[in-house]
Structures are given as C-alpha cells and as structure tokens.
Amino acid sequence: MNLIFKKKSYNFKLSTKVKNSKTTYLTKSGWIIKLTSNDKKIGFGEVSPLLEEDLKQCAKQLNMIPEYVRVFNLSEQINIFHPCIQSAINSALAEINGKIIFKKTITLMKLIKQPYF
C-alpha cells in the first residue's frame, strides 16, 4: 500500500504551567502527522516529545520521511525513528486499518483544515 505523508507543526502556550520532578512546561510543541492511503483512508498521529533535544531530533527525522512512501518501507524502517514518531506512525496506521477509531475534535479539525495540511 502506498501512503501520502504530511506533517504540520504546532506550538502553543499552555493555559497553566505543568511541572514534573525536573522541569516546568509553559508551552507544548510538536507535529500532527497525517497518512493517507491509496483508497483515501486517513490516519493521524501526534509527535510531541517533552525534551528540547528530542524535539530537535524529531524535526530532523520527520524531514527524512518522504511525502510518498510505501507502508512496507515505513514499517520496516520505523525502528530507526524516535519513540514519539514510532507511536504517531503506529497510531495513524492503526486508524487507517480500522483498528482504532478516534472521534474528531473541533480543535484537531481546525488544525487539519489549514491550507498546508
């Protein structure tokens, strides 16, 4: 199966700060990925690493994925990617294959309807 791969970055300020034992987070950054199959089935995934160095690594790795990709190639090479990217790809593929069904939220749909996506 051939897939079309698209990504859209986001960055927004959190309404309240989020703390863990090491860091306080004021913003959320990442990407929404969209995979579209030959038969126009669509799957989405979110890439949202917490650490700045992981965010940079994910940016580089997402740019390695071509716009047109075979599902076999993606499945074979998924292990080279950061775990956040692996999770996003697996989520998108599962949605395409009907293994998971997400309710589309207004916020996500607004993001997706942007001209680039």
Question: Which residues make up each language-model segment?
Answer:
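N-terminal capping/lid subdomain adjacent to the active-site entrance of alpha/beta enzymes
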Residues: M1-F117
